[in-house]
Swiss-Prot record:
It is found in: Cell inner membrane. The gene is atpD. Keywords: ATP synthesis, ATP-binding, Cell inner membrane, Cell membrane, CF(1), Hydrogen ion transport, Ion transport, Membrane, Nucleotide-binding, Translocase, Transport. ATP binds at G147, G148, A149, G150, V151, G152, K153, T154. This is ATP synthase subunit beta. F-type ATPases have 2 components, CF(1) - the catalytic core - and CF(0) - the membrane proton channel. CF(1) has five subunits: alpha(3), beta(3), gamma(1), delta(1), epsilon(1). CF(0) has three main subunits: a(1), b(2) and c(9-12). The alpha and beta chains form an alternating ring which encloses part of the gamma chain. CF(1) is attached to CF(0) by a central stalk formed by the gamma and epsilon chains, while a peripheral stalk is formed by the delta and b chains. InterPro entries: AAA+_ATPase (IPR003593), ATP-synt_VA_C (IPR055190), ATP_synth_F1_bsu (IPR005722), ATPase_a/bsu_AS (IPR020003), ATPase_alpha/beta_chains (IPR050053), ATPase_F1/V1/A1_a/bsu_N (IPR004100), ATPase_F1/V1/A1_a/bsu_N_sf (IPR036121), ATPase_F1/V1/A1_a/bsu_nucl-bd (IPR000194). Its EC number is 7.1.2.2. SMART domains: AAA. It holds the Pfam family ATP-synt_ab_N. Belongs to the ATPase alpha/beta chains family. It comes from the Bacteria. One of its GO terms (molecular function) is ATP hydrolysis activity.
Length: 457
């Protein structure tokens, strides 16, 4: 190990001087004698390297001795990490003792080559009606949950983990990137109560941590997921929240003195996003299905951060504040959400026709809303009145009680199979349920529950 000393400290950015013949490589991990880990970001010349601190730089002083580990950050991987909470360096933070891993992997790795990659068109059923119908997920695909503050990204993600972990019984890795510590705590207890904790590895780098931790914690989680994939498993990789990953990159970029680009983001935004997203892929050995929550600043989907993320995804689930304000949860916008899987060759003709029919009716209702607002319902033709009635039923039928929200809604969660979902919406489109009041469609599971509820109204 070669040793150097700290020559400058500016917040999370630390300059370390090494002998000219032993300058560390970019991304090497350095250990300060106080126990803090640094990651090399730039070589400034003259034996000086500029590093980002992966932890608080409080109490550091110039002249402290720094050792070069000659490797990037190495984190524990494998089944020993299941049921445990670790930080960006792979150190356990759940007070359950050492992990006792057999193997450690570097967090900086190259993406699988073209020959190794595979694409599948197998669908992954989530049990959430609106998602399975409008924006179905592919096994080994990438899904983005887009939404502003407080429209339900984390709750949707927790429901997906619960449903898929229980129904699909595979391993999951959850990376909490720059989110609230309270959510991390809720999440841990939710997994524990659902008895799926022994199938989930949790990696947390929360809001209160320095930007270096928040920037690298996604890579730590991804490295653990890659290990499971390379063992031939189908893994689920959840990231909450990709926007905070971008934001940490912006902070690090500014600290390193790079010129900002559009809206103050780092000039390397697209490249940083690409490096992460290209590694989240399925190979011929195993698959990684990823679900990523993406915060949309000021509800503006054209902001560079969400816009850069869009390009990498197979399915986009857009959560809308307008739908949430109607009390319809999950607040998924059926007209804005898309999926590459919604193709008759993949999902079958019936599913495709029903999904497009639902979108068609909702689009027509959206156009009629202006007329209704000015002239009232009575001025509509009989045909349009029918469209409005069916659209309102569809809107309500797209809502669903969640297992993870039982505490708030007071009604038990529902898992709806794809077959039941298609049957229900097909019936509404064909007018089989025109005689049933629209209130019966609100917050239920399958169409059979609607009929049951209507009897008691």
């Amino acid at each position: 190990m070669s040793a150097g000393k700290i020559v400058q400290i500016i917040g999370a950015v630390i300059d370390v001087e090494f002998p000219q013949d032993a300058v560390p490589k970019v991304y090497d991990a350095l250990k300060v004698e106080s126990g803090l880990t640094l990651e090399v970001q730039q070589q400034l010349g003259g034996g000086v390297v500029r590093c980002i601190a992966l932890g608080t730089s409080d109490g550091l002083k110039r002249g402290l001795k720094v050792e070069n580990t000659n490797n990037p950050i190495q984190v524990p991987v494998g089944t020993k990490t299941l049921g445990r909470i670790v930080n960006v360096l792979g150190e356990p933070i759940d007070e359950q003792g050492a992990i006792g891993e057999e193997e450690r992997w570097a967090i900086h790795r190259s993406a699988p080559s073209y020959e190794e990659q595979s694409n599948s068109t197998e669908l992954l059923e989530t049990g959430i009606k609106v998602i399975d119908l409008i924006c179905p997920f592919a096994k080994g695909g990438k899904v983005g949950l887009f939404g502003g503050a407080g429209v339900g990204k984390t709750v949707n993600m927790m429901e997906l983990i619960r449903n898929i972990a229980i129904e699909h019984s595979g391993y999951s890795v959850f990376a909490g990137v720059g989110e609230r510590t309270r959510e991390g705590n809720d999440f841990y207890h939710e997994m524990k109560d659902s008895n799926v904790l022994d199938k989930v590895s949790l990696v947390y780098g929360q809001m209160n941590e320095p930007p270096g931790n928040r920037l690298r914690v996604a890579l730590t989680g991804l490295t653990m997921a890659e290990k499971f994939r390379d063992e031939g498993r189908d893994v689920l990789f959840f990231v909450d929240n990709i926007y905070r990953y971008t934001l940490a990159g912006t902070e690090v970029s500014a600290l390193l003195g790079r010129m900002p680009s559009a809206v103050g983001y780092q000039p390397t935004l697209a490249e940083e996003m690409g490096v992460l997203q290209e590694r989240i892929t399925s190979t011929k050995t195993g698959s990684i299905t990823s679900v990523q929550a993406v915060y949309v600043p000021a509800d503006d989907l054209t902001d560079p951060s969400p816009a850069t993320t869009f390009a990498h995804l197979d399915s986009t689930v857009v959560l809308s504040r307008q739908i949430a304000s109607l009390g319809i949860y999950p607040a998924v916008d059926p007209l804005d959400s898309t999926s590459r899987q919604l193709d008759p060759l993949v999902v079958g003709q019936e599913h495709y026709d029903v999904a497009r029919g639902v979108q068609g009716i909702l689009q027509r209702y959206k156009e009629l809303k202006d007329i209704i607002a000015i002239l009232g319902m009575d001025e509509l033709s009989e045909e349009d009145k029918l469209v409005v009635a069916r659209a309102r039923k569809i809107e309500r039928f797209l809502s669903q009680p969640f297992f993870v929200a039982e505490v708030f809604t007071g009604s038990p969660g529902k898992y709806v199979t794809l077959k039941d979902t298609i049957r229900g919406f097909k019936g509404i489109l064909e007018g089989e349920y025109d005689h049933i009041p629209e209130q019966a469609f609100y917050m239920v599971g399958s169409i059979d529950e609607v009929l049951e509820k209507a009897k008691n109204m």
